[in-house]
Amino acid sequence: MEPVIIGALILDVHAKPSTTPISGTTVPGQVLFAPGGVARNVADCIFKLGITPFMIGTLGLDGPANVLLKEWKLSMKGILRREDISTPIVSLVYDTNGEVAAGVAGVDAVENFLTPEWIQRFEYNISSARLLMVDANLSSLALEASCKLAAESSVPVWFEPVSVTKSQRIASIAKYVTIVSPNQDELIAMANALCAKNLFHPFRSDENKLSIEDMFRALKPAILVLLKNGVKVVIVTLGSNGALLCSKGNPKKALNIDRKFLRSGEVFKRVQSVCSPNRFSELGSNRSPSLFAMHFPTIPAKVKKLTGAGDCLVGGTVASLSDGLDLIQSLAVGIASAKAAVESDDNVPPEFKLDLISGDAELVYNGAKMLMVHQSML
């Protein structure tokens, strides 16, 4: 079976001003509708990279749902639709640099209707999945139900934090989670939630100018909290500074994916040929519960907007893992997919050109460098 994705399908309303937004009045620009929601974006990205995920979510029987489903090509079996459900909508106002300046999210339907009972109907899909990804739009009860079903069959779980506030829902499920993918602020919020004290403070804007090594040192205590609470892999997204891959020991062995039955499709063939797994073969000797950390760079992009980048990083990584690549190769594909996302007007590009993705993944992979290996976590 292919990966299972559980979470939000949302209609995004994007307001893109031609000039700097002014409080209290309107400015000229474009207002566009775009399919969105972390889980939906991840599933769409995976599908466009040649893997067919199974999506579990909820939608209304209304106009916004019809817009969302217009280009939907995946199974509808896992998507609950009822007349009393209002399809989730998020309205975003961008600044002239393509970053979100303000937004309002009306996504209560995800928590109210995507219940443990609905999720448990798809026990077979989850128990036989390559990997389960859940987004933090789910209620705590729904997250626990999803993770327990996966744990019963040793299916790896990827937790996508969604936002600073919702990222704290990691507290009740950390022991089930294999991978998390926070940005710096979400990482701090998750660490505080797990240690039940506000020991860590939000990253200051001037700290983004630190060297990668200094940035890692600043984030390391929070990363260790997650790893010591059961999470096996922490991928910290750093925006234009790339991403950190941190794990207990060898990250290639962190996921319990049976590689005998992986499909080895087009993504695998193209990336395996340019991203040699032997480049990091020395990791194979690491059997101790030590801290591993690696930095992955970004590559130059013609940025149109930044929403969707993190979702495509996750989607590209999950698709690659499902196709047989190791975690380091897969994250390189994820970062290449994120680049394609920021160069698109949509949250997920209409298509991914695999020659460009594999070429960009090669650049990321060859630029990756280890920051720490074989140091005790104690």
UniProtKB/Swiss-Prot annotation:
Localisation per UniProt entry: Peroxisome
Record Pfam families? PfkB
Binding-site residues for pseudouridine, renumbered to this chain: 12, 26, 37-41, 137, 166, 311
Keyword set for this entry? ATP-binding, Kinase, Magnesium, Metal-binding, Nucleotide-binding, Peroxisome, Transferase
The name this protein goes by in its record:
Pseudouridine kinase
Q: Where does Mg(2+) bind?
A: 181, 237
Q: Which species is listed as the source?
A: Arabidopsis thaliana
Physiological role? Catalyzes the phosphorylation of pseudouridine to pseudouridine 5'-phosphate (PsiMP). Catalyzes the first step in a pseudouridine degradation pathway. Acts together with the pseudouridine 5'-phosphate glycosidase PUMY in the peroxisome to prevent toxic pseudouridine monophosphate accumulation.
Coarsely, its chief localization is: other
Q: Which CDD domains match?
A: YeiC_kinase_like
Q: What InterPro entries is this protein classified in?
A: Carboh/pur_kinase_PfkB_CS (IPR002173), PfkB_dom (IPR011611), Ribo/fructo_kinase (IPR002139), Ribokinase-like (IPR029056)
Please tell me, according to the UniProt entry, what happens when changing residue 137 to A: Reduces kinase activity 39-fold
Family named by the database record: Belongs to the carbohydrate kinase PfkB family.
Q: What is the effect of changing residue 311 to A?
A: Reduces kinase activity 171-fold
Result of changing residue 26 to V? Reduces kinase activity 13-fold
Q: What is the effect of changing residue 306 to A?
A: Reduces kinase activity 4-fold
Encoding gene per record: PUKI
Q: What is the effect of changing residue 166 to A?
A: Reduces kinase activity 6-fold
Q: Where does ATP bind?
A: 237, 239, 242, 298, 306, 310
CC annotations in GO: peroxisome
The GO terms describing molecular function are: ATP binding; kinase activity; metal ion binding
What EC numbers are recorded for this enzyme? 2.7.1.83
- What binding partners and quaternary form does the record give? Forms homodimers.
Q: What is the effect of changing residue 12 to A?
A: Reduces kinase activity 171-fold
Q: What does the record give as the reaction this protein catalyses? A: pseudouridine + ATP = psi-UMP + ADP + H(+)
